[in-house]
Swiss-Prot record:
The enzyme's E.C. designation: 2.7.8.7
Subcellular location: Cytoplasm
Family the entry assigns: Belongs to the P-Pant transferase superfamily. AcpS family.
Keywords attached to this entry: Cytoplasm, Fatty acid biosynthesis, Fatty acid metabolism, Lipid biosynthesis, Lipid metabolism, Magnesium, Metal-binding, Transferase
GO molecular function, one term: holo-[acyl-carrier-protein] synthase activity
Species whose genome carries this gene: Paramagnetospirillum magneticum (strain ATCC 700264 / AMB-1)
One protein family per Pfam: ACPS
NCBIfam families assigned: acpS, pantethn_trn
CC annotations in GO: cytoplasm
Domain of life: Bacteria
GO biological process: fatty acid biosynthetic process
Binding site for Mg(2+): 8, 59
Name this protein carries in UniProt: Holo-[acyl-carrier-protein] synthase
Amino acid sequence: MIIGLGNDLVDIRRIEDSLERFGERFIAKVFTEAERATAERRSGRARSGAYAKRFAAKEALVKALGKDGVSWRDIEVANDGDGRPFLSLSGGAAALLARRIPAGMIARLHLSLSDDYPLAQAVVIVEAQPA
């Protein structure tokens, strides 16, 4: 059963501006250390695109679940061994997800990311499946 669907489109130039204007303060507020490490392995547009896709994924998840008690760093975007992106939740985000999933069900999160400068997009589906 679908619990929520979220989509977000980010102008990568807006993220570039935030990185330039606020630097470390912006990165520390929004991204986990692992997300930062992933983005910082890149340079130029690839770096800002990596940050923008992760920002879009966080926004898309909030649209799918809600924001109640969730901080940016409670939502982490990572990649599996094949490079597929996935979401890892902690803190307020994990608690909110647990409240949204009916008893006897388990949560499954689906994430798709895309970018084509100057845009980055994320789609998140929150699904509940029988345990």
